[in-house]
Amino acid sequence: IGGALGASPSAGLAQDAGVHSKEDVGKAFPAKPPYSPYAGRRYPERPYFGDEHVHTAWSVDAGGTGTTLGPEEATRFARGEELMATSGQPVKLGQPLDWVAITDHSDMMGMITEIKGGNPEMMADPTLKRWRDMFNGGPVEAKKAVMELVAAQSNRKLPPAATDPKFAKSVWAKNTTIAEKYNEPGRFSAFIGYEWTA
């Protein structure tokens, strides 16, 4: 029996010990579909959640109808901070946003808070003073003031104090400063923005 088996166990394997080509290996191990369907993808795959259209007390429509929170408060709210709403109640998002764009109206941005607050330079104009009284006279009067103001703006009949370029520049500087203050690359994006009033 030993003679029948005669050769050492490694003798049969020695014949297969030669060098194999890539083709031989390819036949022995055929190509498989990619293990990871994501390999080689070059497009973004993580959604970022934010708000691209936020009006604050600086816009005529929001500020004129009761909103008291400005761009800084709106940005802090988007970042997940708790604050007091216009209604006097505490508010906080269930999950912070990844980004926000505060987009108050371009025309008269920030002017409404100055009118409502009785800015002395603006109160020298009788129309702006009357609007201030209407804004502070309750929701019905405030809505009428907003409609008058929008009509005057649409017809290019706003008082000169309401279109002062120096004031507009100062408001825009505040707006950009707020966005830059809260922008944290990699954590939260605060975009500098506005809505073009047409």
Where are these regions (language model features)?
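Sec-dependent N-terminal signal peptides
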Residues: 1-2
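Extended, charged catalytic domains and RNA/DNA-binding interfaces, predominantly
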Residues: 14-198
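Boundary at the C-terminal end of the N-terminal hydrophobic targeting segment
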Residues: 6-14
